[in-house]
Amino acid sequence: MKTLVICSGGLDSVSLAHKMAAEHELTGLLSFDYGQRHKKELDFAQACAKRLGVPHQIIDIRTIGASLTGSALTDDVDVPDGHYAEETMKVTVVPNRNAIMLVIAFGVAAAQKADAVALAVHGGDHFIYPDCRPGFIEAFQTMQKHALDGYADVKLLAPYVHATKADIVADGAKYRTPFEATWSCYKGADRHCGRCGTCVERREAFHLAGIDDPTSYEDADFWRATTQKRNA
């Protein structure tokens, strides 16, 4: 099945790209520049495409992102420290981000005669991000069947939607994902901060999967305290 992967350059989507390359016919990686402060992630997506020998396209939607105000990922708002399961992390929501990206990706896939679009949403995202939940994935697929009716039949693949990030790490290891060549941190500095929600989740995922984390963190121990606090 000819598959186009939406790839941010993060651990989840790069692992997904390696999985799709092994299980399907990977036709390319599609990334989005929406004005995110951690734009350096796109360099890791480019490196992934080169490694897998497929085209990489970056869609510039910064003018759209500029209208989706109030998120710590795009605006001058501090990225909070802590676990994703905390209410404070809702400031990292970019309204309809996945929906917007998927609409564009399905159009690109249809134009390129691809059979599927793959997205790396997972169970750990459900608490914070509405457009990462199973209900959204199912509804979006239904909508696209109507939107492309008579023109193309493009499937939405979300193999991790019921999985944990630890499951993704295990799957990534299975498909030899070079984890050191992925970027997660929302703060976009030279090193992973180790304190933002995505850094904490990343570090915890490696621990739970029993796989060594090759990532260099500014604060390598913060995740323990915040996960213990969450589980207390």
UniProtKB/Swiss-Prot annotation:
Keywords: ATP-binding, Ligase, Metal-binding, Nucleotide-binding, Queuosine biosynthesis, Zinc. Its EC number is 6.3.4.20. Gene3D superfamilies: HUPs. Disulfide bonds: none annotated. Pathway: Purine metabolism; 7-cyano-7-deazaguanine biosynthesis. CDD domains: QueC-like. Zn(2+) binds at C185, C193, C196, C199. Its cofactor is Zn(2+). It is an enzyme of class 6 (ligase). Catalyzes the ATP-dependent conversion of 7-carboxy-7-deazaguanine (CDG) to 7-cyano-7-deazaguanine (preQ(0)). Belongs to the QueC family. This is 7-cyano-7-deazaguanine synthase. It comes from Brucella canis (strain ATCC 23365 / NCTC 10854 / RM-666).
